[in-house]
């Protein structure tokens, strides 16, 4: 009975757990599996949790998810899918500058508000020109002007309905013979708002709505497919022109200035300086060059894992920092070069420093599951960059293959000999371009099929929301505020605790995540 007679009353609650400062000031390097977050009080549903996060000083995303600039992870297909689901993708640079810029262009053209530079043909162009345009751009709703250029008089439009049933011998017909004539078109006047134009397009039941000035000259066009995308993807990441956001990676060498120019012309929103060790004079000079030439272009520096590294890049003018060195599943930098830092410690230390300057942090590497994402965000990261977690999705580059009956896709580190042999950009990332003997800092492997991003990312989003609910925070901003104030508590896990926290004591089981 005496055990129940301890004084203090019902208001007494013993201090429990560790603050983030206490957890990470012990001198040990910790990674995501080494600790847990202690739960809080729930008075809201998971779907009320706001995941809005800062990617950079000027770019905000509705979900804190970013795809890595790796040649087996992010090209246009992945970047489009990530932007539609509220994140952003970074096109890799292990390719020619022209290829990379074209991938960015595909993302920026995928969804638009007012399209001010559409494909335009003239009445004297032929049907085969429409099929060529369709093969190149993926659509065939093409306005026809008297000169075949924007800014000249609109005379008609060609749609799939005009050409679907034409025979091969009719492909030499002039477009003026088969196009929908101007008098049969629904158009809107220049100066109309996008909302008003969309309403006209909905009522018209047409595929395209040309926008013309008082002289009947074509100045823009809007598409019904974009209306449907707006409806189907309410979280989509877009710029001021209603185009999808897109990032791209570049290096820090003189040749990368040409690549930068092509990317800027393609409309890239943000560039990440892709280096395994970002605290270099080469990166500092490149940051200053970009900020001088393209002051409105957002620049992400990295990779860094210490406050001292971060300071130099912040002083140079970066808009965000990428944190991680040697923690990726395909990275062997820590093993080979003895440099790096366990990822949880790196994220906390850099985030705690960078927040004083309003610089967001991207946690890059070591993410194996949705719990790791939640932990990275709780340690101060604004967004999380993923490579292996998104590899082998439908939208990732590469073809599927089968091994022992399992459907796989290739996945490799940019420091692997495979990637270095493909293009010089991978060597530049690891300062290896002049080496006679290449020192691999990554490996090549394969990852099991995960299905489409459009199913996988919503699962990740729901998982993060449920994690925030268990913590007792209605937003990621609140999670970070609780962490820095000491309200959010953590606890170290022993190896036995980690075993207990996983699946155990079963003869067999099936682990289905979504």
UniProtKB/Swiss-Prot annotation:
Regulation of its activity: Mycophenolic acid (MPA) is a non-competitive inhibitor that prevents formation of the closed enzyme conformation by binding to the same site as the amobile flap. In contrast, mizoribine monophosphate (MZP) is a competitive inhibitor that induces the closed conformation. MPA is a potent inhibitor of mammalian IMPDHs but a poor inhibitor of the bacterial enzymes. MZP is a more potent inhibitor of bacterial IMPDH. Subject to product inhibition by XMP and NADH. Also inhibited by ADP.
EC number: 1.1.1.205
Cofactor: K(+)
UniProt-listed Gene3D superfamilies: Aldolase class I
Tissue: IMPDH1 is the main species in normal leukocytes and IMPDH2 predominates over IMPDH1 in the tumor.
The CBS domain, residue ranges: 114-173, 179-237
The keyword DNA-binding is annotated on this UniProt entry: yes
InterPro entries with a match to the protein in the record: Aldolase_TIM, CBS_dom, IMP_DH, IMP_DH/GMP_Rdtase_CS, IMP_DH_GMPRt
One GO-annotated biological process of the protein: lymphocyte proliferation
SUPFAM superfamilies referenced in this protein's UniProt entry, alphabetically: Inosine monophosphate dehydrogenase (IMPDH) (SSF51412)
Numbered residues of crosslink Glycyl lysine isopeptide (Lys-Gly) (interchain with G-Cter in SUMO2): 195, 208, 438
Residues bearing the modification Phosphoserine: 122, 160, 416
Modified residues annotated as Phosphotyrosine in this record: 400
Localization per Swiss-Prot or TrEMBL: Cytoplasm; Nucleus; Cytoplasm, Cytosol
Record keyword NAD present: yes
Family indicated by similarity: Belongs to the IMPDH/GMPR family.
PANTHER family, per database record: INOSINE-5'-MONOPHOSPHATE DEHYDROGENASE 2, INOSINE-5-MONOPHOSPHATE DEHYDROGENASE RELATED
Function noted in UniProt: Catalyzes the conversion of inosine 5'-phosphate (IMP) to xanthosine 5'-phosphate (XMP), the first committed and rate-limiting step in the de novo synthesis of guanine nucleotides, and therefore plays an important role in the regulation of cell growth. Could also have a single-stranded nucleic acid-binding activity and could play a role in RNA and/or DNA metabolism. It may also have a role in the development of malignancy and the growth progression of some tumors.
Protein name per the record: Inosine-5'-monophosphate dehydrogenase 2
Species whose genome carries this gene: Homo sapiens
